[in-house]
C-alpha cells in the first residue's frame, strides 16, 4: 500500500527478507522499513546498516508507532499511525531536504479512493497467497491483548463497496482470496452489502470474524453464498471469568457449541484461536481446551500463550506488576516473555506443546475432519502441515527464555529512488 501511495515518478522496489536477501549496496535514495514488535530488532539492524551507508531511513508500523522514541534512534524519520495522508508529504519533504523527525497521523484517514496495492512488486512465485485485500480497518472491540486497538483506536471504518469490488476485479479469481480485516463482520449491515456484491464474482475467500457473526442467520447465509470457505474465530478461552478479564465481551462461552454448529451448517469451516496461560488459568486449562476443540470438531485451531505487545492493556498491567521478563523484542515471536500467575513458565510451555501435539495427532485429525465432504483435501492438508510444522517448531523451543535464539521473522523494506 505504501508503494501505491508513492508519487508515480518515484521508482520503488520491495524486498522481503523471507524471500530475498537485502542488497545493501543497491543505489537507493530512501528506505522505508515496516516493523512489528517481533521484527523490531531486525528492522533496527537493517536501518542502522543503511544509515551507516548514508541512506535516509523511514520507520513505520505498529511498533514504531507505539515506541517512537526507541524507533527514532534507528531512523531519520518515524511515521506514527497509518500512512495515508502522511506518506506523500514525507516524500515531498525528502525531495526538498526538509525531512521531519516525526510524522504523526492526527486523525484517522479516510478509506475513500485508496489506491490499488502494487502487487506487481512481489517476487514472482514466492508466496502461496497473493490475493489479499481489506474491506475494513479496525475492530469495534477492545481486548486487552490486542495491538489493533492501540494502533487504530476503537474504531471501525469501511471502504466503499464499489472500490472493494474494483480491487477484487484485479485479483486472480481462481485463487483463494484472503480478507486481512481484523473483523470482516464488525458492521453487519456493511458486511451484508459486501457479501451480496461478491456473489457474482464466484470467488473463494476466508477472513477473521467474531462469534457475533453466528447471531445473524442472514449474514451467515450471504457469507456462504459469496464464497466464504472458512472463518477464523477468536474463542480465546473457555473460561467466562477469563473473557471478562481480557475484555472480550462479544464472546459467551455457553454459546460456543451453538455458534460452531450454526457456522458449520452453512458449509463454512472454522479455524479457532485459543489463549493458554491467562491469569485465571491453572494446569487444567490444557486438558479442558484441547478436549473442547476436539469435541467441537474444529477443522483447525491455534493455541498460543499471551504475548504482551507494547501499547496494549496487557503489556501495561504486566509491566506495572513486574511480570515481563524481557524486552528483547526478538524473543516475542516464539518465547514466553512474562511470568504466568497460576503456573510456572515450564508448565505453560510444556502444556501448550502437549495441546498442539494432541490436537494435531493423527487420531484427532481423523476424528475432526475424516468424515467431511466439503474441502476435505484442503482441510486435511492444512492439518498435516500444522502437524509437521509444529512438531519441528516445538523441538526447537526446548531452550529457556534467556537462551540466544535465532531471529526468524518477516522483514520487509521498500527502497525508493527519487
PLM region descriptions:
Residues 5, 9, 49, 53, ...:
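Alpha-helical structural signal in soluble globular domains
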Residues 68-70, 189, 241-246, 276-284, ...:
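Flexible glycine/acidic-rich beta-alpha junction loops that bind and position SAM and/or redox cofactors
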Residues 116-273, 291:
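Radical SAM [4Fe-4S] cluster-binding motif and immediate context
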Residues 58-59, 79, 102-103, 206-208, ...:
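Structural detector of well-ordered beta-strand residues that form the stable sheet scaffold
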Residues 1-171:
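Acidic, low-complexity intrinsically disordered segments
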Residues 28-32, 37, 194-198, 202, ...:
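Short, electropositive alpha-helical surface patch
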Residues 70-89, 222-232, 288-303:
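Structural recognition of alpha->loop->beta junctions
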Amino acid at each position: 500500500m505504501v508503494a501505491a501511495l508513492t508519487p508515480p515518478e518515484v521508482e520503488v522496489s520491495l524486498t522481503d527478507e523471507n524471500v530475498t536477501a537485502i542488497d545493501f549496496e543497491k543505489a537507493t535514495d530512501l528506505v522505508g522499513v515496516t516493523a512489528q514488535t517481533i521484527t523490531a530488532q531486525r528492522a533496527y539492524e537493517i536501518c542502522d546498516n543503511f544509515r551507516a551507508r548514508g541512506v535516509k531511513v523511514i520507520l513505520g508500523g505498529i511498533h514504531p508507532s507505539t515506541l517512537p522514541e526507541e524507533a527514532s534512534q534507528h531512523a531519520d524519520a518515524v511515521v506514527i499511525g497509518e500512512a495515508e495522508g502522511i506518506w506523500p508529504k514525507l516524500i515531498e519533504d525528502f525531495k526538498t531536504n526538509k525531512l521531519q523527525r516525526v510524522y504523526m497521523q492526527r486523525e484517522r484517514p479516510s478509506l475513500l479512493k485508496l489506491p490499488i496495492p502494487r502487487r506487481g512488486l512481489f517476487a514472482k512465485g514466492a508466496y502461496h497467497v497473493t490475493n489479499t485485500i481489506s474491506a475494513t480497518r479496525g475492530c469495534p472491540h477492545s481486548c486487552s491483548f490486542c495491538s489493533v486497538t492501540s494502533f487504530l483506536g476503537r474504531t471501525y471504518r469501511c471502504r466503499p463497496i464499489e472500490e472493494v469490488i474494483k480491487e477484487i476485479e484485479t485479483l486472480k479469481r481462481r485463487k483463494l482470496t484472503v480478507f486481512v480485516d481484523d473483523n470482516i463482520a464488525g458492521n453487519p449491515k456493511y458486511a451484508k452489502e459486501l457479501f451480496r456484491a461478491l456473489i457474482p464474482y464466484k470467488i473463494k475467500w476466508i477472513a477473521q470474524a467474531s462469534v457475533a457473526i453466528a447471531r445473524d442467520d442472514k449474514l451467515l447465509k450471504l457469507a456462504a453464498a459469496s464464497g466464504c470457505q472458512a472463518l477464523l474465530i477468536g474463542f480465546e478461552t473457555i473460561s467466562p471469568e477469563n473473557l471478562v478479564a481480557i475484555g472480550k465481551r462479544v464472546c459467551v462461552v455457553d454459546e460456543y457449541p451453538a455458534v460452531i454448529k450454526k457456522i458449520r451448517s452453512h458449509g463454512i469451516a472454522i479455524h479457532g484461536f485459543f489463549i493458554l496461560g491467562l491469569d485465571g488459568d491453572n494446569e487444567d486449562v490444557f486438558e479442558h481446551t484441547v478436549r473442547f476443540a476436539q469435541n467441537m470438531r474444529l477443522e483447525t485451531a491455534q493455541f498460543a500463550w499471551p504475548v504482551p505487545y507494547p501499547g496494549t492493556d496487557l503489556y501495561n498491567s504486566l509491566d506495572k506488576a513486574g511480570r515481563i521478563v524481557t524486552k528483547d523484542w526478538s524473543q516475542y515471536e516464539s518465547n514466553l516473555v512474562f511470568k504466568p500467575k497460576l503456573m510456572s513458565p515450564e508448565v505453560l510451555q510444556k502444556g501448550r506443546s502437549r495441546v498442539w501435539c494432541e490436537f494435531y495427532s493423527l487420531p484427532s485429525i481423523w476424528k475432526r475432519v475424516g468424515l467431511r465432504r466439503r474441502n476435505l483435501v484442503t482441510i486435511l492438508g492444512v492439518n498435516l502441515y500444522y502437524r509437521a510444522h509444529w512438531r519441528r517448531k516445538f523441538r526447537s523451543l526446548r531452550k529457556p527464555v534467556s537462551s540466544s535464539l535465532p531471529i526468524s521473522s518477516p522483514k520487509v523494506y521498500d527502497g525508493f529512488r527519487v
